[in-house]
Amino acid sequence: CIKCGQCVQVCPVEAIKLADLADGYGIGVPHIEARTQACDFSCDGLQCVLACPTGALTHSLNYPAETRMGFARLAQPDSCLAIQGKGFTGQARGPDFTGTLRYEEIDRWNPISVADHPYDLELCDLCMRQCPIEIRIAQCEAGTPPSGDANQCPPRHAIVFESIGSGKAMMPVISDGCVGCGVCEMICPVNPTVIVIDIDKSADTVMAQGN
């Protein structure tokens, strides 16, 4: 990485930032703070990878399911609304949250403000509902893969819900299809967030370790 900022310029949701002195990554290093603005793969074609002039972002990657940005984990499971069997109504992060997502049922190409998209859920499933990998799997199962390209179909789930007991409570379970995009962390309505991204891990390393 030569800190050129090309990836920052092409990101459609402005998820990539150049680190400042206080961020702890090294001045000018591109990074994503998922809780503030996650990567939702709005571009489909991984524009940050295509824009990178040096190969610091691996040019062999062509599709979202191939990326490895980190791995999600439940950091505060006792606070999870789904585990408590609770629903959620309202703006996921409140009226002042500035993060954006691409809601394909509203606009295929243009991300909109999360604050402008309230929810009314009998059981909170926002982490799975908005997961870009799970959205793509659902599209592919319906016979409508993203951009009409079957290669965009993820081979594995990123997050699934498993029943807890006999009630409606559900446990979010991170699967080996997780790419660490951070949408689950960004959209979680609980503060502090229930789910976080470990940027020093990936699906490959976690599954190899059996953790």
What label would you give each PLM region?
Residues 2:
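Conserved catalytic residues of ABC-type ATPase nucleotide-binding domains
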Residues 6-23, 43-65, 88-104, 119-120, ...:
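Iron-sulfur cluster-binding cysteine motifs and their immediate structural context
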Residues 199, 204-211:
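Extracytoplasmic/periplasmic copper-protein system
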